[in-house]
């Protein structure tokens, strides 16, 4: 077979426009199409959804692993199911928080997300004790509360660091939670999934990346999949 390395497809306006003409042009270079990029499956672009109309299309091994591992969270997870949502952007996390308010046993939010939370506080929503927009880490009381919940969980999803982990003085919360999840995962008491660029970077910095059950390669794609149960790129392969 032949290999052809293409330039960044987004330099062509037809990629993001999901142009049928551009999708056909891409399809003309191959006999089959394999999508192995979970991290871009939330985009309805020519190389992700458009091309599947013109070639026999399949999910690659990495994409299949992402789907099967994330479905362990969304479809009949072993309970209690606990979800930890961190980071600073509430808007991008809101759909997945609201989804898990309906389906998870516990949903824990970082101090910054807690400070900005103005929606319904359901019984399973656990806000940080230090709800402050200036807060750069969860405090000791919150760490203990979160760890007690994790201790009695059987499945944990974590998306978003719990503090400004880049600075050593603000990594304590993220470190404590990462170590607790890693410890329980390694002793087979917990199935753990972690995802998102900052979360993965923080856990890698702590040297714990290989201590979790599954590390997702998706950030926005993972959040959308968890909220909706599918993605445009995955749906396109199923048609």
Task: Set out the residue ranges of the language-model regions.
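Active-site loop-to-helix "anion-binding N-cap" substructures in soluble metabolic enzymes
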Residues: 1-239
């Amino acid at each position: 077979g032949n290999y052809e390395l293409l330039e960044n497809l987004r330099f062509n306006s037809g990629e993001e426009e999901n142009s049928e003409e551009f999708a056909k042009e891409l399809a003309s270079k191959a006999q089959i199409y394999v999508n192995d990029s979970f991290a871009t499956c939330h985009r309805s672009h020519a190389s992700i959804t458009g091309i599947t109309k013109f070639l026999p299309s399949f999910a690659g091994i990495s994409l299949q692993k992402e789907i099967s591992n994330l479905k362990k969270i969304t479809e009949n997870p072993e309970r209690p199911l606990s979800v930890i949502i961190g980071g600073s952007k509430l808007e991008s996390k809101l759909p997945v928080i609201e989804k898990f308010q309906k389906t998870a046993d516990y949903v824990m939010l970082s101090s910054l997300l807690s400070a900005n939370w103005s929606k319904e506080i359901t019984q399973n929503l656990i806000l940080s004790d230090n709800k402050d927009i200036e807060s750069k880490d969860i405090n000791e009381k919150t760490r203990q509360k979160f760890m007690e919940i994790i201790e009695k969980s059987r499945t944990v999803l974590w998306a978003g660091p719990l503090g400004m982990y880049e600075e050593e003085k603000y990594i304590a919360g993220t470190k404590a939670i990462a170590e607790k999840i890693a410890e329980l995962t390694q002793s087979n008491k917990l199935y753990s999934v972690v995802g998102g660029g900052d979360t993965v970077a923080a856990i890698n910095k702590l040297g714990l990346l290989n201590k979790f059950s599954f590390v997702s390669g998706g950030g926005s794609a993972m959040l959308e999949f968890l909220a909706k149960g599918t993605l445009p790129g995955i749906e396109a392969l199923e048609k």
